[in-house]
Swiss-Prot record:
UniProt keyword annotation of Ribosomal protein present: yes
Molecular functions (GO terms): structural constituent of ribosome
GO cellular component annotations of the record: cytosolic small ribosomal subunit
Assigned protein family: Belongs to the universal ribosomal protein uS2 family.
Coiled-coil regions, chain positions: none
The encoding gene: rpsB
Keywords: Ribonucleoprotein, Ribosomal protein
PROSITE patterns per UniProt: RIBOSOMAL_S2_1, RIBOSOMAL_S2_2
Protein name: Small ribosomal subunit protein uS2
Organism superkingdom: Bacteria
Pfam families: Ribosomal_S2
Cited CDD domains: RPS2
Species, as recorded: Leuconostoc mesenteroides subsp. mesenteroides (strain ATCC 8293 / DSM 20343 / BCRC 11652 / CCM 1803 / JCM 6124 / NCDO 523 / NBRC 100496 / NCIMB 8023 / NCTC 12954 / NRRL B-1118 / 37Y)
InterPro entries: Ribosomal_uS2, Ribosomal_uS2_bac/mit/plastid, Ribosomal_uS2_CS, Ribosomal_uS2_flav_dom_sf
């Protein structure tokens, strides 16, 4: 059984790539055609590669791997936080701080500062301080929570990165590459696939597309952690006899652009 159906991908708009003039030629093998100046992603390949990504994440999670979900653009921010949390994993969904991986010891000191401020806010310490100082400390706490809240409980460097848009998250991907941390990524037609270990050709600019793929990655983590008998009931889809052929999808796309 496939993890995802062609119909699901189509309905979420996963097939829409970028304008042809913005493409990266290395993505050519994942492009089915071009319609009205827009590249159309080959969803048959996406179905297979989602399966590969799912299996990779599931197997890593079975071995206890920690997965860091990364997606800082507005289309990805909510889904990244919600799905990582659902899977009991970690996330960065606002801004990637340079050195998050390669300078982890420094990041750990900032995380400890965040935890100290959270404790001070909860144990009554703030009530004993001047109001002006409390205002400044709260601002510091809120800023640290925004950028580091999703990784404050991460025990160490992640074992795998799941990234939405490696072009946008270039620094995160470079750091992972330097440390030999595998990168699984949703990658659109404008990005270089060579920097990614496990590729999912997909529209990484549509909220529905991002949420669909990210939810499958979260399902993979959950299955890996809990065992196959406890896999999410909707993690797999039965073979759909009515699934459109790639030619029919092309026709649907063409009609939608008219």
């Amino acid at each position: 059984m496939a993890v995802i159906s062609m119909k699901e991908l189509l309905e979420a708009g996963v097939h829409f790539g970028h304008q042809t003039r913005r493409w990266d030629p290395k993505m050519d093998e994942y492009i089915f055609t071009e319609r009205n100046g827009i590249h159309i992603i080959d969803l048959q390949k996406t179905v297979k590669l989602v399966d590969e990504a799912y299996n990779f994440i599931r197997n890593a999670s079975t071995d206890g791997a920690n997965v860091l979900f990364v997606g800082t653009k507005k289309q990805a921010s909510d889904a990244i936080a919600e799905e990582a949390t659902r899977a009991g994993q970690y996330y960065i969904n606002h801004r990637w701080l340079g050195g998050t991986l390669t300078n982890w010891n420094t990041i750990k000191t900032r995380i400890q500062r965040l935890k100290d401020l959270q404790t001070m806010a909860e144990d009554g310490t703030f009530e004993q301080l001047p109001k002006k100082e409390v205002v400044l400390l709260n601002k510091q706490r809120e800023k640290l929570e925004k950028f580091l809240g999703g990784i404050q409980d991460m025990p160490g460097l992640p074992d795998v990165l799941f990234v939405v848009d490696p072009k946008k998250e270039e620094i995160a991907v470079k750091e992972a590459n330097m440390l030999n941390i595998p990168v699984v990524a949703m990658i659109d037609t404008n990005a270089n696939p060579d920097v990614v270990d496990v590729k999912i050709p997909a529209n990484d600019d549509a909220i529905r597309a991002v949420r669909l793929i990210t939810s499958k990655i979260a399902d993979a983590v959950i299955e890996g952690r809990q065992g196959q008998d406890s896999a999410p009931e909707d993690a797999f889809v039965e073979g759909d006899e009515n699934t459109e052929s790639i030619e029919e999808i092309a026709n649907i796309v063409e009609e939608g652009n008219n």
